[in-house]
């Protein structure tokens, strides 16, 4: 992939950009096989990859510069700002949004936050696009509510320029730290969730719910999990760390009992909305801590699907699953190192199947799906 920002030495986020995609996939596969070298893996499935550029559905832009000439991008370690509006990972549909946002910031008087001086209001711009209809969600991350009235007043101009903006919010993040968002979300539009669709499954994206950034590969990941589950004798499953319900909603059948657990209430609201649309009445989604939920249950499903954050599922949940011994575990991981550590803690399971998904091209990161079967 050609990138003027990389060639000019202005951005080094894509550390593997000089390697061809097949070379990147080979290196990632070798890394995964090395991590799982102590285990017997029955089947290595072919790796899945997607487009090498224009694939991201989300932009997280630090706002810097001045109110008259804002920069959208990132800050280098020395505090120097870098405009990333031309990043080739973003789809072409993002360019007109960035182009309209710069004069809008001036119109609304949203002074960019200056980290060194601890002054200013606008910290980040967060943009998400739906692949199904091109609708977008725009979030202004502000230090306080000081400029909220000005933002509301100027908003009709932006909506006229960009009718694709379906959901617009102001997120209040008052802490002087590199934290992307605060707890308070103020909706500036009537619509509060962005409609998405993968493999004919309706999904919803709300401001504070996690959603995969590579929709082409994510939809293949969910479809693969569904295919694996359909091959198993499963009538009851748990979907832990379920997010907006992507895995559970794909895997569920009308006669299957499924419980999805996620700590973020916003994500659970999305999952419930999707389940209602699909008419799946035996699905239950609850906003709870996944480990706490699992370890207080008396009954055990045939299948537990886990999709934890980078830290993995951790020893308490591993110990519980080892004791309760569900027949199958499907582990989806964005960090194969912590997944490997967790699998070591899961006693009495063999690895039936492993598949790598290249969710993050041009970096060392990847997603992996693993099927574990009780011995």
Curated annotation (Swiss-Prot):
GO terms for molecular function: 4 iron, 4 sulfur cluster binding; iron ion binding; rRNA (uridine-C5-)-methyltransferase activity. The keyword Protease does not apply. Gene3D superfamilies: 2.40.50.1070, Vaccinia Virus protein VP39. This is 23S rRNA (uracil(747)-C(5))-methyltransferase RlmC. Belongs to the class I-like SAM-binding methyltransferase superfamily. RNA M5U methyltransferase family. RlmC subfamily. The keyword S-adenosyl-L-methionine applies. It holds the Pfam family tRNA_U5-meth_tr. The active site is at residue 334. NCBIfam families: meth_trns_rumB (TIGR02085). [4Fe-4S] cluster binds at residues 3, 11, 14, 87. SUPFAM superfamilies: S-adenosyl-L-methionine-dependent methyltransferases (SSF53335). Catalyzes the formation of 5-methyl-uridine at position 747 (m5U747) in 23S rRNA. GO terms for biological process: rRNA base methylation. It catalyses: uridine(747) in 23S rRNA + S-adenosyl-L-methionine = 5-methyluridine(747) in 23S rRNA + S-adenosyl-L-homocysteine + H(+). Keywords: 4Fe-4S, Iron, Iron-sulfur, Metal-binding, Methyltransferase, rRNA processing, S-adenosyl-L-methionine, Transferase. It is an enzyme of class 2 (transferase). CDD domains: AdoMet_MTases. Its EC number is 2.1.1.189.
